[in-house]
Amino acid sequence: ILLLVPTSYFIYHWISEETISDITPGTLGGELILSDGKSFNLSDNNLPENAVRAFVIDSKGINYQIPANKPQVKEIQNILRTLQGMECLITLSDGTRVHLNAETRLTYPVCFSSKERIVQIEGEAYFDVAPDKEHPFIVKTSHTSIRVTGTSFNVRAYADEDTESTTLISGTVRINSGNEEFELVPNQHYTYNKNTGTN
């Protein structure tokens, strides 16, 4: 279903700020799960950092800062999981900013090194994607694939809900739900029904 809809509170709260990175101190909360299975609470101060896990954590969230002179490495996947009542902002290695709503799980590479920038999400998040026409950004949910080059949009895909939805704020996105593909324009809303397999 494609609809023109008012902006939800979650989206409006973040795009109405002077900048998306202005997160109020104290809202940071969640768990970082590294590729080796080790997990850390974001409030801890003893998080590891090495050549392929170069990040800074502060009151604004997680900011990946991969040095330009580091050799290209295979894509190592980390997971950021927010807890109930918590939110978190993460800046990925390409500069894309993702604001995770409560009870959301984002799987992403520490450093994008392939032709496509691919992340996976379960829950709800607002994406402000860094433009890069040569390396499309793809967000995968359990039932859809959202392809962009540089744009802002919201994805809601909680496992315990009957639908998945995408709301486009700016730019364009293409959504693939199996045999069908849709292109959204700003302020357009896409919904996929998991029970019926229909859009």
Regions found by a protein language model. Give the residues of each.
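Propeptide (latency) domains of metzincin metalloproteases
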Residues: 167-168
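Conserved active-site beta-strand-loop modules that form the wall/rim of enzyme catalytic pockets
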Residues: 164
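Short acidic/polar, Gly/Pro-enriched loop/turn segments located at secondary-structure boundaries
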Residues: 2-161, 174-197
